[in-house]
Every structure is written in C-alpha cells, then in structure tokens.
Amino acid sequence: MRPADTWKDYELLDATEGNRLERWGETILIRPDPQVVWKTPKQSPLWAKADAVYHRSNQGGGEWEYRRRLPEKWKISCGEGEEKLTLIVSPTGFKHTGVFPEQAVNWAWYQQKIRAAGRPVKVLNLFGYTGGATLACAAAGATVCHVDASKGIVAWGKDNAVASGLADRPIRWLVDDCAKFVAREKRRGNTYDGIIMDPPSYGRGPGGEIWKLEDCIYDLVTQCEEVLSDKPLFFAVNSYTTGLSPAVMEYMLKTTLVPRFGGKTSCDEIGLPVSATGGVVPCGATAIWEE
C-alpha cells in the first residue's frame, strides 16, 4: 500500500460504517465509501460537527445535506515550493469534490520521474479529470496533453491551472473521447514520453461513445503503446474498480510494453491514512511501467 500521507489541507479524520469523515481545508464533510465495511466505534468528535453530509439515494446518485452554509467552491493546496498545487474543491451531485486526494502519492512520483529525466518530457494524461496529475507534471517541467470527455471538467482543470499559477505552462486542454484521440495521434505520428491513464469503470465520450473498463482497457493500452516515444519514461494506469486488480493491470503493461521497451513493471494499492486509527483506507490501485 502506498499512502498519500503528505497532505496538510486534506485529512481523513475517521472512517466507519460505510462513511469517511474528511477535512477539506477548514470544511468537514461526511461521504460514503463502499470500502469502509467495518463498524468500529467513531473515534472523532467531529462526526457531530460535519458541515455537510452526502446521502445516497436508492434510485442511484444522491444529495448533500448542508448543516451550515458553505461556499460553492474553495481552494486547498498540496505539496510545497515549485511542486505546490492549488486545487479547487466543490461538492458535486455524485459525492465527489473535484479532487481525489489519494492520487497525491502518484503526482509526487510523476514529478520525481520528470525531474530526474534531465531532458524535455511530453506527457499524455487520459481521463484527466480536473487536472491534478496534469498540473503536477507541468509543475515539474513537462509539456502535457490533457484529455477528458467532459467539457465542464476540463474547464475545472483550467481553473486549477490558474489557481496553481500554471496557466502559462505548455498544457493542451482537450475535450475528446480518449480512444479516438489516441488513434488520431497515432495517425499524426505524435508521441509521448509518459502516459497516465485514469479510466472510469463506465463512461460516455462526448459523442456518446460507450466506455466499459473491463471491455475497453486492453485495447486502449495497446493503442497507447504505439504513441510512446522511442525512449519513454513511464506508463501509469489507475483503477478505482474492484473488478480490475493491480496484478491484472500490471500484467497488461508487462506483456504490452516490456517486449518492446524493456524496463520494469510494478503495482500496488494506494490509500489514505486515517488520523483516528492509524490505519489506511484503500482507494484504488496503480500499475506502472518505467524505464
């Protein structure tokens, strides 16, 4: 398990009975988490002082119960110095806030690889969401192409770039279907030194294209192999679904990339440390190929 344990503006205070108690800056939120199957006693007094609670609906989705008036959005920071990112938090109707804090452990890893390369690095970030990984790579000096199917989410990413003081960095922000974009990049002869992929379990492209993780992931990985440069640095695949284990993702990268590029693969869960107990809540997994 690789814990994201360097946050100051985010904290997983406690977790029990299917819920997380979280601090986002000065705001306390309670959100459901299907991984939290244990029913241990609540350790934090802040359970009773949460500013907002997300309630799931039996029909799917859910809604927020606000116990005090909150701003529509606010900012939190991650990292320090040149690698500091400032990200906009806003509770959405799908329980998310615009930031997956567990990914900070990956952001730091990407930055280390880019800085150590000692050469210009081009990164492709697919299913890039609100741009945490994109901005981490850009802050480390990379040229980045960010692709997501949601126009609103890409706009959020651009706002994060402004908040982080990175709006002038070489970032292309694209609203597109990831598989179609990669196919076009192959035809154009464009290549990348690093690829990051953060695919959802299920989704739709801007043209109504259907994405189902288990059915589509291998084809996309093999397509991406063809847009890697001659001397790539890394290829990272993140997964949030329990149906795709870290070992399965690593196997795909090992059999697809190692025969051509050499290098090595690894995989592990990523998670968030719980302040009240010292345990770590698993939040997904990452498989990595690196030179």
Question: What are these regions, as identified by a protein language model?
Answer:
Residues 178-258:
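S-adenosylmethionine
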